[in-house]
Amino acid sequence: MTIALGRVTKEENDLFDIMDDWLRRDRFVFVGWSGLLLFPCAYFALGGWFTGTTFVTSWYTHGLASSYLEGCNFLTAAVSTPANSLAHSLLLLWGPEAQGDFTRWCQLGGLWTFVALHGAFALIGFMLRQFELARSVQLRPYNAISFSGPIAVFVSVFLIYPLGQSGWFFAPSFGVAAIFRFILFFQGFHNWTLNPFHMMGVAGVLGAALLCAIHGATVENTLFEDGDGANTFRAFNPTQAEETYSMVTANRFWSQIFGVAFSNKRWLHFFMLFVPVTGLWMSAIGVVGLALNLRAYDFVSQEIRAAEDPEFETFYTKNILLNEGIRAWMAAQDQPHENLIFPEEVLPRGNAL
């Protein structure tokens, strides 16, 4: 009995191979398979944002001016969220709300859902791009894994939080001042600064900035003198065969400063990766909790004592009162459709608070 072994011949012009060859070709700007998701979504997200901030009003959704055309500047322009009455509608241009009318679609806040969803997929495409390139040049995928932190924050804040609330209306609008207002909203309605997940997020981001500054300064301080160049950047010569800086010297320096120091480059750099990414993920988890209206720390005993004793006050009780002021002022402004009416004595008085 004879068994013939051989390869199955593929067509020379196989469509997949042609596309793979073109997409992954070495060019100035790598495209790749991930680019099929990244580039269109990033183009539409940025294009929608520039269009909205330039031309589109928020009068119909928030009663606000939000475009350059209406007199806003870069800090005050925004692509605003849809009205609360539209709940979690995807607001498709051809959907029942806009019915194919582009002007009506913009007035209803359709650009916000357009930018948010395309932006989320663009970020995912960018992470896939890092996976794809890492595989192509045989690198570990830690860059892509690290980028999951910003993606988690974006998705939790712009998508999951409003999904847990009554509609997209309660998500942040895409603008600088709009984001600031959302932060104030988070503080007033969720006491966000006292949330342990926010604390871990702040520790991660600021700790990463500190680590980055210390690491950069230490490397600069311990660069080898490898030539007669006039400046520090001589040491960045890519043809240099040996390592650029002295880990031993850096370890000795920080051992004397703190009593402890990293003695292993891999552990040092993993720690620099771990701190900010963990901080971002903790913040994202905290925002998911807020979507479900989970509360931050409540020191009820201090609130009760402050209510009983006018002379007893802590920074916590002062902040609780400030949060009440934010809620009283913001709720009526942001949700006029609720017809919220607060007695005059509980409302802040002008700029005096």
UniProtKB/Swiss-Prot annotation:
Pfam families: Photo_RC (PF00124)
Principal localisation: plastid
Cofactor binding: number and manner: The D1/D2 heterodimer binds P680, chlorophylls that are the primary electron donor of PSII, and subsequent electron acceptors. It shares a non-heme iron and each subunit binds pheophytin, quinone, additional chlorophylls, carotenoids and lipids. There is also a Cl(-1) ion associated with D1 and D2, which is required for oxygen evolution. The PSII complex binds additional chlorophylls, carotenoids and specific lipids.
Sites of Phosphothreonine modification: 2
Reaction catalyzed: 2 a plastoquinone + 4 hnu + 2 H2O = 2 a plastoquinol + O2
Binding site for chlorophyll a PD2: 198
Annotated residues for binding of chlorophyll a ChlzD2: 118
A single Gene Ontology CC term: photosystem II
Membrane topology: Multi-pass membrane protein
Transmembrane segments: 41-61, 125-141, 153-166, 208-228, 279-295
Sorted UniProt keywords: Acetylation, Chlorophyll, Chloroplast, Chromophore, Electron transport, Iron, Magnesium, Membrane, Metal-binding, Oxidoreductase, Phosphoprotein, Photosynthesis, Photosystem II, Plastid, Thylakoid, Transmembrane, Transmembrane helix, Transport
Keyword Nuclease attached: no
GO molecular function terms listed in the Swiss-Prot or TrEMBL record: chlorophyll binding; electron transporter, transferring electrons within the cyclic electron transport pathway of photosynthesis activity; iron ion binding; oxygen evolving activity
UniProt-listed GO biological process terms: photosynthetic electron transport in photosystem II
Subcellular location: Plastid, Chloroplast thylakoid membrane
Binding-site list for pheophytin a: 130, 143
Further information: 2 of the reaction center chlorophylls (ChlD1 and ChlD2) are entirely coordinated by water.
Role played: Photosystem II (PSII) is a light-driven water:plastoquinone oxidoreductase that uses light energy to abstract electrons from H(2)O, generating O(2) and a proton gradient subsequently used for ATP formation. It consists of a core antenna complex that captures photons, and an electron transfer chain that converts photonic excitation into a charge separation. The D1/D2 (PsbA/PsbD) reaction center heterodimer binds P680, the primary electron donor of PSII as well as several subsequent electron acceptors. D2 is needed for assembly of a stable PSII complex.
PANTHER family cross-referenced by the UniProt entry: PHOTOSYSTEM II D2 PROTEIN, PHOTOSYSTEM II PROTEIN D1
Protein's recorded name: Photosystem II D2 protein
Source organism: Oryza sativa subsp. indica (Rice)
Lineage: Eukaryota, Viridiplantae, Streptophyta, Embryophyta, Tracheophyta
